[in-house]
Amino acid sequence: MSTKRTYQPKKRHRSRVHGFMKRMATSNGRKVLARRRAKGRKVLSA
């Protein structure tokens, strides 16, 4: 028995866990976005 790869990408899971709406939903998430804007990130969230 071998162990499986732990990263099994799914678009829905990615956006629900790390997406923009999820970030905007909490005050800490908004802080994350503010930090990334201040740093000049091209992509703010998944």
UniProtKB/Swiss-Prot annotation:
Q: Which residue ranges have biased composition labelled Basic residues?
A: 32-46
Q: Which GO terms describe its biological process?
A: translation
* GO molecular function annotations of the record: structural constituent of ribosome
Q: What's one GO-annotated cellular component? A: ribosome
State the Pfam families in the record: Ribosomal_L34
InterPro entries associated with the record: Ribosomal_bL34, Ribosomal_bL34_CS
Q: Does the keyword Transferase apply?
A: no
Recorded hits in Gene3D superfamilies, A to Z, give:
1.10.287.3980
Q: Does the keyword Transcription regulation apply?
A: no
| Region of interest: Disordered | 26-46
Q: Which UniProt keywords apply?
A: Ribonucleoprotein, Ribosomal protein
HAMAP family documented for this protein: Ribosomal_bL34
* NCBIfam families the UniProt entry points to: rpmH_bact (TIGR01030)
UniProt lists the family membership as follows: Belongs to the bacterial ribosomal protein bL34 family.
Full protein name: Large ribosomal subunit protein bL34
Species whose genome carries this gene:
Lactobacillus delbrueckii subsp. bulgaricus (strain ATCC 11842 / DSM 20081 / BCRC 10696 / JCM 1002 / NBRC 13953 / NCIMB 11778 / NCTC 12712 / WDCM 00102 / Lb 14)
Q: Which gene encodes it?
A: rpmH
